Amino acid sequence: YVEASRGCPFKCEFCLSALDKTAWAFDADQFLAALAALYQRGARNFKFVDRTFNLKIDASVRILQFFLDRMAAQPEAPLQLHFEVVPDHLPERLKAMLAQFPPGVLQLEVGIQSFNPEVQQRIARKQDNATTAENLRWLVEHSHAHLHTDLIFGLPGETWQSFAQGFDRLHALRPHEIQLGVLKRLRGTPLARRSRPGQPAEFAMVYDAQPPYTVQQTGAVDHEEVKDFLRLARYWDLLANSGRFARSMELLLQGESAFAAFAGFANWLWRTTQDTAGLTPERLVDALSTYLCAQRGLPETVVRDALLADYVGSGARASPAALRGCLPRSAPASGKPAGGERQ
């Protein structure tokens, strides 16, 4: 873990970084010398904990050039780099650098949180949504970076419907991962102070009294919707973010709204299993087969072919009922695809 800068200049009210007065960078020459020493000692996996790696483009470019130079000198040496970036600030100089990295090296964590302008205003989040979408599209099409994006459910004023619209907008850009989080109460943040009695209705937030202080209801979503979303997020991790079911997810998410399609499956899966913790890949294969064929009316051969390709590609070795008689005698243990599949 390395840190080229500290602090955050943004004031998102749900985040403890909103309390920072400013952000500042450490001396660039000293930092690069320290990086060189780590690299010389064999370090190849660098996770930058900077809140905003692309805040100062001159510094970002120098750091990226440092790694490009070492990759050119030792192309056989594996390298992994993780950066957290703001999505609406990717000047051409930075894009030119990012485009030079080969697959498997860069992971970019891109916090979206919400595409709803009214919600963004309530939480003091400054984000150009059009530029954000344009830059994400560029990263998908012109870089080899693995894109980990984030959305938060339960922000003040965010309804189930508006969250669904934001999800669909993000999903259409095809990042590798969409992390679905639920708002937590962080003591001392501006949003926590706004949740006290007497605040406007959109800030009528109720949180669990036990850690991690997850929101239970807001002025825009009730307790049942929060519970539904928590289950949905768990299933999304198992199916989409795991990378195990890329082809099957293409079938599942067909329709005008990917979020609505997945929410329908999540509700059905909960009613059918009453389980979120014990769902093995084999149980998920069988559940997807039943749902896609019986509930969605898709052809059995199409569903089976997608599930078979996903299951064999994941390296799993058991025998789900839906694939009995279809599996090869020895399935290759390939694991999760390097770089992940697009969502």
Feature-to-residue mapping (PLM):
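Radical SAM [4Fe-4S] cluster-binding motif and immediate context
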Residues: 1-141
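Accessory C-terminal segments flanking Radical SAM cores
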Residues: 3, 199, 273-277
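Radical SAM enzyme core and accessory elements
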Residues: 8, 231-343
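Generic intrinsically disordered, low-complexity segments enriched for polar/acidic and small residues
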Residues: 11, 36, 50, 64, ...
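Short linear interaction motif-like sites in intrinsically disordered regions of transcription factors
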Residues: 15, 59, 139, 161, ...
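Conserved C-terminal portion of the radical SAM core fold
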Residues: 32-49, 82-84, 102-114, 128-256
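Short amphipathic alpha-helical patches
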Residues: 58-62, 121-125, 193-194, 252-260
